[in-house]
Amino acid sequence: MKVRASVKKMCRNCKIIKRHGVVRIICSDEPKHKQRQG
C-alpha cells in the first residue's frame, strides 16, 4: 500500500473509495496499485 498526498487511478480497474474520511484506491487487477491518502 502506497501512502500519498494525491492519489490517482493508475489503470482502468482502479476504484476510488472513501472510508472513514480517508480516500483509498483499490485495484482488483494489480495489487501494487493500492493507495491511501495521508
Curated annotation (Swiss-Prot):
GO terms for biological process: translation. Keywords: Ribonucleoprotein, Ribosomal protein. The keyword Zinc does not apply. Signal peptide: none annotated. InterPro entries: Ribosomal_bL36 (IPR000473), Ribosomal_bL36_sp (IPR035977). GO terms for cellular component: cytoplasm; ribonucleoprotein complex; ribosome. Pfam families: Ribosomal_L36. One of its GO terms (molecular function) is structural constituent of ribosome. NCBIfam families: rpmJ_bact. HAMAP family: Ribosomal_bL36. Belongs to the bacterial ribosomal protein bL36 family. This is Large ribosomal subunit protein bL36. The gene is rpmJ.
